[in-house]
Amino acid sequence: VLIVAYGGMSKLALQVKEVLLSKFEVGGDVVILKQLSPLSFSLDLLKDKYEYLISIEEGIKEHGIGGEILANLLESEVKIDSLIRIGAFGIFGTLASSEERNIPNLDWVIKIIQQRLDVI
């Protein structure tokens, strides 16, 4: 599993990696993007090493970094089994509690991964 994140989701990505290893014995790596465009990592990194790629972002997943990674994968010769894009819900309120419910958290991300991957 390769987990890609940036900004505010960087710490969460590292936590997800630890939970996947400790609870499910699924190893992986984390890439923290320094910039979003152009991508600050090479897709060749994925070649023959990872079956699954998980992108985590605090913005909505539509038109986000996960979509950009997917587009780059489709244009390349690199193949992976599954890309899981995790992002915020598209509707934000004005209250802090609303923001907390909309931005990905550890439990939410692990639940999505469990639903999507057959290895967990």
Question: Residues of each region from the PLM?
Answer:
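Thiamine diphosphate
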Residues: 1-120
